[in-house]
């Protein structure tokens, strides 16, 4: 299943109105608009594309009248109305983990999730799942969460493996001159001084992608184990 995430109602309009048969679902994001206008545009999009795709919508305004970022916990009443009047299949709810919040503000609100679940059932998408503890992740479906976003975890937790590989293969990736320079500057130690020549197998995008993909598969497997094992 291929999902088109954070498709902006205006900037991505051409894409949103194109042939999306290769996608299973799309997040139609009109959250920069006031609530009523958001619902109007989302409802119209559901009417045009709702028979072709599973559509995910965002019921919260992310900016106030002054253009300031808002990060309020989603209200169950508003969420129920949004789903009823737009016809979306899944609603993105801010449950304290939204990426717009600063790090010290991230705190998953299972109570808010369950209040929404009581109104719309298990049709909630959680963004910012990377900041949720493993114990909480195990219980997400009970809270009404049917879809999660974990891209930050995929990027963050796969990065160390790529960094380690690059450091250990500095000469093969960048050549012996760069390796020697980094040793002189103190960024690498003498044990890194292999003197190897750079090689195509190490400085291609494919080589780095293979490392990242391998690590990402492990991360996804970890999430699946939390839910199903």
Regions found by a protein language model. Name each.
Residues 3-5, 55-56, 125-127:
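Structural detector of well-ordered beta-strand residues that form the stable sheet scaffold
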Residues 95, 128-130, 152-154:
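Active-site proximal loops enriched in glycine and acidic residues that flank catalytic Cys/His/Asp
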Residues 121-123:
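Active-site clefts of carbohydrate-active enzymes
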Residues 138-229:
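C-terminal alpha-helical cap/extension of soluble enzyme domains
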